[in-house]
């Protein structure tokens, strides 16, 4: 049992209120002006914000098969440090969770080593990237969160349509990395100013938006919940906006780096700035920000993609795609958008908690009496530089090295258990 004393919580209007919070038996038992500590532990939250634990539906934990990049343990330690209490792990592992047996093995490993809640995706196709569909029903029974072939787009419309029909029958979501392989052209960055300056092959916007346009029509026909991963282009935002207006059940996420950066920020041919989707144009970034504010884009997800140093500290042509994000998402977004008065604090918290929970019908993301005690304590005055040497993640690959941020998670509770406190994993 914990009593979080002298903290602040956000009310429904987005105003800060001074409150104590009682955690008992893994639940939020009481939120009140003052709670007397008669037993259990007192946690001093003076001057700090007590918020729901963050939810990230797009995380690469790499285990099994990629343990040199990340493990379930290190990835969930990174999540705890970043204030995340629920993360959803992508299936581009070896082996791929494309069968009941692999999924059950993965679930056992999660139970054994994870520091926070991990909800694993199953793949859509066998081995991830084939045209043979997995056994959707068996994988749902084994605990799959949803179905995705993240890392590659499902190339054949017929394959995707059949997958959507099967998912719809089980009330499960299809989550899509949208990329038409015939439109990538071997690109490593966005097909724009930076690619031209550096003489690099570029990935055009249509590689993403064309597949989203196809998929929203398939989702309408199948009656499926279709979720777009890491949306990055103005055309994609337009397609999703139109689909929502038409009543199609489509949701979308955006990553912190696509909100903060565009191609003009890239300092040179540095593998730590290579990600998929790539950093797009200023116009694309503006469309993403507009889409998030008007509800076209539903929430924020990191696409945490750790790699070993030798896979990133090379030119872009040779580097792996992806950057880490779990440990830096909140401070970056708070610094860039809340401190500059572009967003309210409540908007940011909602996009990292209740919005993803609502989209995927998860019973998390709220701080109220009776809710699961997934909690992050945030010091909104704390100032620190982003230093990969301090990361719990094995991946140190971030373009934000050295950036000064204000507003950091200082403690994280997962189902009432203190898993991170003042720089230490418990």
Swiss-Prot record:
Matching entries from NCBIfam families are given as: PRK09357.1-2 (NF006837), pyrC_multi (TIGR00857)
Gene Ontology annotations of biological process type: 'de novo' UMP biosynthetic process; purine nucleobase catabolic process
GO MF assignments: allantoinase activity; dihydroorotase activity; zinc ion binding
Cofactor(s) needed: Zn(2+)
Residues that coordinate or bind Zn(2+) 1: 58, 60, 150, 303
Q: Per its record, how is this protein called by name? A: Dihydroorotase
Describe the function of this protein. Answer: Catalyzes the reversible cyclization of carbamoyl aspartate to dihydroorotate.
Please tell me whether the keyword Zinc is annotated for this protein: yes
The family line of this record is: Belongs to the metallo-dependent hydrolases superfamily. DHOase family. Class I DHOase subfamily.
Identify the metabolic or biological route this protein is part of.
Answer: Pyrimidine metabolism; UMP biosynthesis via de novo pathway; (S)-dihydroorotate from bicarbonate: step 3/3
**Which GO cellular component terms, listed alphabetically, does the Swiss-Prot or TrEMBL entry include?**
cytoplasm
What are the catalytic residues?
303
Domain of life, source organism: Bacteria
Cofactor comment:
Binds 2 Zn(2+) ions per subunit.
What gene is it encoded by?
pyrC
Q: Which residues bind Zn(2+) 2?
A: 150, 177, 230
Reactions catalysed, semicolon-separated, are: (S)-dihydroorotate + H2O = N-carbamoyl-L-aspartate + H(+)
What PROSITE patterns does the record point to? DIHYDROOROTASE_1 (PS00482), DIHYDROOROTASE_2 (PS00483)
Provide the binding site for substrate.
60-62, 92, 276, 307, 321-322
Question: Which top-level enzyme class is recorded in the Swiss-Prot or TrEMBL entry?
Answer: hydrolase
Q: Which UniProt keywords apply?
A: Hydrolase, Metal-binding, Pyrimidine biosynthesis, Zinc
Could you say which EC number(s) this protein's record lists?
Answer: 3.5.2.3
């Amino acid at each position: 049992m914990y009593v979080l004393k002298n903290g602040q919580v956000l009310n429904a209007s987005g105003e800060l209120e001074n409150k104590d919070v009682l955690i008992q038996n893994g639940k939020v038992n009481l939120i009140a002006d003052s709670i007397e500590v008669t037993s259990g532990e007192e946690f001093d939250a003076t001057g700090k914000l007590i918020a729901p634990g963050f939810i990230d539906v797009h995380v690469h934990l790499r285990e099994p098969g990629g343990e040199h990049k990340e493990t379930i343990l290190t990835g969930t330690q990174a999540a705890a440090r970043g204030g995340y209490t629920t993360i959803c792990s992508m299936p581009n592992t070896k082996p791929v969770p494309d069968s009941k047996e692999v999924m059950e093995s993965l679930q056992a490993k999660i139970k054994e080593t994870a520091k926070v809640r991990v909800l694993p995706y199953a793949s859509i196709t066998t081995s991830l990237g084939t045209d043979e569909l997995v056994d959707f029903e068996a994988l749902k029974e084994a605990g799959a969160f949803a179905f995705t072939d993240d890392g590659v787009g499902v190339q054949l419309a017929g394959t995707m349509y059949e997958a959507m029909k099967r998912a719809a029958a089980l009330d499960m979501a299809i989550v899509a990395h949208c990329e038409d392989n015939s439109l990538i052209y071997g690109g490593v960055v966005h097909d724009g100013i930076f690619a031209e300056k550096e003489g690099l092959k570029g990935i055009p916007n249509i590689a993403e938006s064309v597949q989203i346009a196809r998929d929203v029509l398939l989702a309408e026909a199948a009656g499926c919940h279709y979720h777009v991963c890491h949306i990055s282009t103005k055309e994609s935002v337009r397609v999703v906006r139109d689909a929502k207006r038409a009543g199609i059940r489509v949701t979308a996420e955006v990553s912190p780096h696509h909100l903060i950066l565009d191609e003009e920020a890239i300092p040179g041919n540095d593998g730590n700035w290579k990600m998929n989707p790539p950093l797009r144009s200023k116009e694309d970034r503006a469309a993403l920000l507009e889409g998030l504010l008007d509800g076209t884009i539903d929430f924020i997800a990191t696409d945490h993609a750790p790699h070993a140093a030798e896979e990133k500290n090379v030119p872009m042509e040779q580097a792996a795609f992806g950057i880490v994000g779990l440990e830096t998402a909140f401070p970056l977004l708070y610094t860039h958008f809340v401190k500059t008065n572009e967003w309210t604090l409540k908007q940011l918290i909602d996009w990292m908690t209740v919005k993803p929970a609502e989209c995927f019908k998860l019973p998390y993301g709220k701080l109220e009496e009776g809710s699961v005690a997934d909690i992050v304590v945030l010091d909104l005055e704390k100032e620190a530089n982003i230093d990969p040497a301090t990361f719990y993640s094995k991946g140190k690959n971030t373009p934000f090295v050295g950036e000064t941020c204000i507003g950091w998670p200082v403690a994280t509770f997962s189902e009432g258990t203190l898993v991170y406190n003042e720089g230490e994993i418990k």
